[in-house]
Amino acid sequence: MAADIRVFTCLSDNFGYLIHDPATGATASVDAPEAGPIIRQLEAAGWTLTDILITHHHHDHVGAVAELKQKYGCRVVAPHDKTTAIADVDLRVGHGDVIKVGELLARVLETPGHTLDHVSYVFDADKAVFAADTLFSVGCGRVFEGTYPMMWDSLLKLRALPDDFRLYCGHEYTASNVKFALTVDGDNEALKARAAEVTRLRAANESTIPSLLGDEKQTNVFLRADDPAVAIKLRMKGATAEQVFGELRERKNKS
């Protein structure tokens, strides 16, 4: 039976996600940015929280873990590295591990760069990937703890997923990401179409997430750092993908 995925806002621009297994009643929250919105979504749906799947240790992703665990007695799953900074961890996971949420299966991808401990959760049967702050719609996360080559390698892992997978990321940054992408890749017709769609969605106060990975592969310039055409646009003909990615990330940092 397919997962029921709910998308909502936490804090100022974080996404909250609930993944519900109708067969067993199990429900997971991907990260725990803020308790109030998560609890309200659970109560509105008549669900009980059984699991929290943590992607990385930043406070805006784990700030509500202790409160939710106290209220629901849920299992807390977190990446191996730096989990001492996360309260009440029950299960620590790494690359290739598979977690069960009821009868739903989530595969762990290690996707470091934004932080060293960052992981993404892939629900293959539901064609969904929760990439938090590694891959955004039309963008990617800042590289705080890792290196640019490390982050590029993480993006390649996500890019390798099928085109019909849906991307669920950590923040509503799509409008800003589109604005930057157009400065580099302004003649990309798919990107221009996505920009128009994002403008319409945000004007209606609607979410831009999920997006399809196939669309990201066409419109997200960070996923195309190994495309010679992108290097040429940056006046970096002959540069490595890692060098091109680093230049893109530096430019976005300053935008």
Swiss-Prot record:
GO terms for biological process: methylglyoxal catabolic process to D-lactate via S-lactoyl-glutathione. Gene3D superfamilies: Ribonuclease Z/Hydroxyacylglutathione hydrolase-like. It holds the Pfam family Lactamase_B. Zn(2+) 2 binds at D60, H61, D133, H171. Monomer. Thiolesterase that catalyzes the hydrolysis of S-D-lactoyl-glutathione to form glutathione and D-lactic acid. This is Hydroxyacylglutathione hydrolase. The gene is gloB.
